[in-house]
Amino acid sequence: MKKRLIACMALAVLVALPGVSAASQALFLQKCGACHKKGGTAAPINPADKAGQVWEKYFERGRHPGDPGASGGDLKAIIDYLKAHAADSDQPAAAVIPK
């Protein structure tokens, strides 16, 4: 049931945010949402919380502990998603991690 809810929410956001890579968004929801959901171990986030360059530098400087299960390619896709929907982007995203 929970997986269906996440899939439905992801689909709704995809429709609302044209040009989003479905795979990148799915990684964001899965990997980031594991901790950054309401009641999770980390504060809730959404891409529009920061400017694109801030997201990139945040990860470059190693400030985020990361997901031990995320490969380098997954992390790049997540960062690309965050930058594409950051506060200073053409399509800033509202919160998309299920609460």
Pin down the residues of each PLM region.
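N-terminal, post-signal-peptide region of Sec/Tat-exported proteins
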Residues: 42-80
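Bacterial N-terminal signal peptides
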Residues: 8-16
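Sec/Tat-exported extracytoplasmic proteins
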Residues: 36-39, 59-63, 82-89
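The canonical Cys-X-X-Cys-His
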Residues: 31-40, 78
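Bacterial N-terminal signal peptides that target proteins for export
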Residues: 1-9
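Residues immediately within or flanking Cys/His clusters that coordinate Zn2+
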Residues: 25, 29
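Sec/Tat signal peptide C-region and signal peptidase I cleavage site
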Residues: 17-23
